Amino acid sequence: MAALFNALDNFTPSQIGENGHSEFTWSNSTRESILQLSFQLTRTKDAAQIDKLSYVADQILTQLTTDYKTNKIEREEYLGHMSIMFRLVGQTRDIIEGKGEYTLAYMLLAVWYKHNRTLAKFAFQCFVLGEGHPYGSWKDVKYMIKYMEEHKTGEELIEYAIYLLNMQLKIDIIAETPSLAAKWVPREKSAFSRLFVRLASDYYADYLTSAKTDHSFTKALSKSKMDYRKLISELNRKLDTVQIKQCGQAWSKIDPEKQTSITMHKQKTAFLNKTKSGKQRTELDDRVLCASHFEQFASKAASGEVEIKGKRIGLNDFTKDALELIRYGQQKSSEADILNAQWINNALQTGNLGKMVAMIDVSGSMSGDPLNAAVALGLRIAEKSLLGKRVLTFSASPKWVNLDGCDDFISMVSTVQHADWGMNTNFMAALNLILDAIVQQKLQPEDVEDMVLTILSDMQIDQADREYGSMMELIENKYAETGMRLYKKPFKAPHILFWNLRSTSGFPSLSSQKNASMMSGFSPALLNLFCEEGINALQSCTPWSLFIKSINSDRYHILEQRLFEELA
C-alpha cells in the first residue's frame, strides 16, 4: 500500500492539449512541479495564468515545508529544493544570465513573502544592488510596489524597497559618480504619484515627525515633496540624463554614443525627428540638428565604424520593430540601421551553438510577443549554428528557410515572414519534412543524431496518432521508424530542446527524459548552456539536469547562501 501511495504522490497525469494532442499536465511530484513551474515562467499578460503559477509556487513551498516537518523528506532534500525555488526568483528577474522578467519575478517574490519575509526582502535587494550587476535595476522599485499594491500584499517589502531607494539617493547626492536610482524615481504628477509622496515622506521623515498640528503637518508634507523634487532634479542634472536635455529644449546636445540600449531603442524615431512612417516631425532647428547627429551615427554603425548598445533589448521587441519598419517600407532608413546595429551588439551575449537547428512555430496561438520572440530566437540560433543560417517554420505547412542571402536582421525577418503565419500547428508535417530529407539523402546515424533540434513553440501542436503519446514520444518514435526504414536499425533522435514561449498547463516531456531539455522565456541568455556541450553529454542530459545547470550559475549562489543562513 505504501508503494501505491508513493506512486500516486509522484504521478504526472496526462491531458489533451488545446489542439487535441496528448501532453503531460501539472504533476503531483515536487521535483517535477519545480521544473514545470520553471517551464511555464514565460511572459504573459494573462492575469489568471499568473495567478495559477503563483498557486503552484505556493503549493511547492508549502509541500516542502510540510514534508520536512512530518519527516517525509530529509533535511538535505528540503534545503536543496528550497534553494532551487529561491534561486529561481533570481533567475526569473536576472537580465544578465536569466529570463529578465518583471511581473513573474514579482509574483515569485510575493509567494516567498508569504512564506519568509526576510528572504523575500533579501531577494528584492539583489534586484537593485549587488557586487556585480544586480538582477534588475532601480526601475524595479516602482514596478514591484505597483504589483504588491494591486495584489494587496507585501507591505514590509514595499517599505524596504522605499528604504533601499532613499538610502541610495543619500549616497548619490555626495558621490562623484551617482547611480541611476534618481532616474527611476517616479514623478509627482504621474501614475506613481502616491509612491512619490511615500518616498518624499520617508526621505524627509524628520519634517513630518516635528509637526505638532494638522496645519503644520500639511506644510511639512508640502515642503518634503518640494525638497524631494529638487533633490531628484539635482541628481538627474548630475547624471546628465536625456530627459533633462529634452525638457530643456537641448536635443542637439544629446550624444548618440552615450545612450543606453533601451533609450536608443525606444527613442530612436524621436532622436531622428521622424514619425513611424518616416516623415519629419518638426522643423525646429534643435530637433533637426539632433536628427543629423543621429543619422551620422547610424550611418557609421551600418558601416561597422561604431557599435550601438543593444544587449538589454527584448528579442520580441527586435522582431516587432523590424516588422513595423517592413510595413512602412523603411528597411533602408536610419532607424533600420540602428535596429540592425543593436541586433549585432545583442548577439555578442550568445556564444557559438554547435550543430543546432531552430524550428519556429508561427501558428495562430503564437501571435504577438510569443511569435516575435520565437522568430528572433530562431534567427539568433541560425546565426550562431555550425550548420549554417537556416530555420524551419511550421504552421499549417512547414517551410525550410535559407537565410544565406540576408545580410542584416531586418532582411532575415522579411525572409521568414514569407512563410505561412497564423494558421494551425501542424508539427507532424514539419517533423516529416526533416525525416523525408534524411531518407532521401540516406543520412548516416551519426549525422542524424549529432545535433540539437530546438522547438520554439507553445507546444500546443495538432493532434497526431494517439499511439505516439506525448510530443517527445512522438519525436522518438518517428525517428526510430525512419532508421528502421533506411538501415533496419532505429535512429536515436537528436537532442530535443523544447523552448516554451507561451504559458499553458501542458508539458511535452517529463523531467527524467534523457536526451531532452525544457527551457522557456524571451531571453537568449540560456542558449549559452549549449555552447560547450558535446553530443555525448547532451544525449545523457535530462530536462532536470539542464535546469539545475542553469540555476547553478555563480550569480545565484548569494541567494543560496542567504537561504541556508535563514533556515539553519
Each language-model region and where it sits:
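Long lumenal/extracellular ectodomains of secretory and single-pass membrane proteins
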Residues: 1-373, 383-568
